[in-house]
Amino acid sequence: MTKQKQSLLTLYKASAGSGKTFTLAVRYIAMVVREPSDYRHILAVTFTNKATAEMKQRILSQLYGIGNGLPESSSYLEKVKEFLPDNFSDNSIKVNALKALNFILNDYSHFRIETIDSFFQRVLNGLARELQLGSGLALELASLHQFTTPIFTPIDTSIVEVHHYNP
């Protein structure tokens, strides 16, 4: 990908057991290894609280493992390298992994991996504030699932990458 065409959105959809957590963690880690402060500009959305917790734990533990050269993180390190420029040294990867880990742990509220429900709730709360509707706005989760299931289910069998480019 050239510097003129930077991906603003990457969307992965896949069935259970297909490696979504691994894939998302690798991509997230690659982004923050490239630029450690970018964690503040990344949003990962999952369907369940369990998936959210697993994703956060995986990213933090792999940043630690990569940064400290732990053998159990070698599969992540090799995949992360695929998304980094060739001139990115192993030492730079280690240093930036630890730097990103430190940034995230010291600014955890900006480590944005959340469920689709909490994402929509936050968006609606912001919209309500902008429209001066007060804080009584609530998201009805059953309705949200009825809305999102028909959208996401038909393409839930393969990983799809969608790119929106800056001209």
Language model segments and positions:
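P-loop NTPase Walker
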Residues: 1-130
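DNA-processing P-loop NTPase/helicase core
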Residues: 46, 111-113, 118-167
